[in-house]
Amino acid sequence: MEPTGNPANPGLTPSGHVDTFARDHLPPRERWPVLVHDRPELHYPDRLNCGAELLDRSAERFGAERPAFHAPSGETWTYGTLREHVDRIAHVLTGELGVRPGQRVLLRGPTTPWLAACWLAVMKAGAVAVTVLAQQRSQELATMCEIAEVRHALCDIRSVDDLIKAGVPGLSVTTYGGEGPDDLLARAARHPGRYEAVDTAADDVALIAFTSGTTGRPKGCMHFHRDVLAIADTFARHILKPVPDDVFAGSPPLGFTFGLGGLVIFPLRFGASSVLLEQAGPKQLLPAIGRYGITVLFTAPTAYRTMLDQLDAHDVSSLRRCVSAGENLPAATWQAWHQRTGHRVINGIGATELLHIFISAADDAIRPGTTGRPVPGWHARVVDDSGAPVPDGEPGLLAVRGPVGCRYLADDRQLQYVRHGWNVTGDTYVRDPDGYFRYVARADDMIISAGYNVAGPEVEEALLRHPDVAETAVVGRPDELRGQIVVAYVVPREGARPDADRLREFVKGELVPYKCPREIVFLDALPRTATGKLQRFRLRTQPPQEPGP
């Protein structure tokens, strides 16, 4: 097959795509970060289809009879069953729907084995998966479809209304989980259970993952087939160290790269299985651990803290790895979980732009209060605004590079994220002299009050040490005299009635006085995205309130 001939990106392997939109809209090569493949496990062949690697090769290596996915219905799909379903769906995509290699296919629905099968089918068909969340609304969906020029969608029948409401011109929507001969699953049943994966290049785009877009137009992050394997061959291989008998589960949805990696890519890469829960809050996760013998758990810090109050009624003895990401893991939460369960929570920082976690630590290498060290295969440093490294112990911007990098789809914000060959994530960090990286705040979340720098997460950590506090978020509010003042929003623990003045006195006993919140506001819940990330910007825009009781 001939190369696409995109002059902005010479040196790419000849593409397996017929529709070259994704490759044609990669940033010019000079705007890419430096990509590093300095470990043997990251040396991939030029021709690579990640769907075939994750499914076909794993079935051959570990056995088609091994379990792959478990569903709350009690049904278990083996690798062989999964392969048959995936291959039949791939036949529908290419034989009935006319999907050509390189075309974008939007995937939408709650976390189920069928959604995972659709993703794998898109991979094997050589198309590009556009992963979205079941909770995203019509306007968001319309914008994403416009950016990625989506013309095909596979959608759970329960999640189709907002997609139809989006009114995307020329969009062909095929639903699954319904009734009738036109349902995807009915169509798939009429096709053979074997499909030869399209001969894609390792550097063909496999998926477009959109950032949340909470502060502006969503950014589409384009990732290659080799990138999908690279996150498994770095974080999963070296930090999680999976074995075929592992059972993965977690709260992040498959439309979120944290969930796609933790619940589909990682277990399939290593012959393990995963429990795909449609409802995966703390109340559902805890009983599922004992029921399925879950060994590897992925969820957010807030969930770990919430589960602490319910642990006594559940058996969590099967757990081997507990992973936290999505937001900073407070040391108080880490200590409380460790004391109750004996498990050391694996902290980590990842990004949609880099697909998954790139700084972390496990077992005896964990240091509570730090994120960890660069995962093998990744490199990180702390820099100033000019890109120059800052001395250990001084705060600066986190800069990262490794086998995966930021490549926005036709978006000038590429110039902000990639600087001097490094991915600059927008997080403020300190590197300790022993090489551990310590989170300070999002760069735009630093509070400057009367000339003092205050990191909101540090104040949050102090508040979380108070027994009456379940959750908290600390932001800066504009103030004529001080520039900004520190404001804390607090969700009380169930049954508690904390007093604002006493909380302030408690914080003064933990931190220097200028970091103490001048206002404390009590809320029933903090604003979060569909993936559970805290939306601090919504708190910053709230009008001043009377201090809490």
Give the ranges of each region predicted by the language model.
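Conserved AMP-binding/adenylation subdomain of ANL enzymes
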Residues: 126, 229-247, 254-296, 310
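Conserved ATP/PPi-binding loop(s) of AMP-dependent carboxylate-activating enzymes
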Residues: 373-377, 388-420, 434, 452-454
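Conserved AMP-binding/adenylate-forming
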Residues: 75, 92-136, 253, 453
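AMP-binding/adenylate-forming catalytic core of the ANL superfamily
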Residues: 136-139, 153-156, 297, 400-402, ...
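Structural core segment of the AMP-binding/adenylate-forming
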Residues: 1-21, 95, 120, 124-187, ...
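Gly/Ser/Thr-rich phosphate-binding loop
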Residues: 294-299, 308-367, 379
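Conserved AMP-binding A3 loop
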Residues: 78-80, 199, 206-230
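Conserved pre-ATP/AMP-binding loop-to-beta segment of ANL
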Residues: 65, 175, 180, 190-210, ...
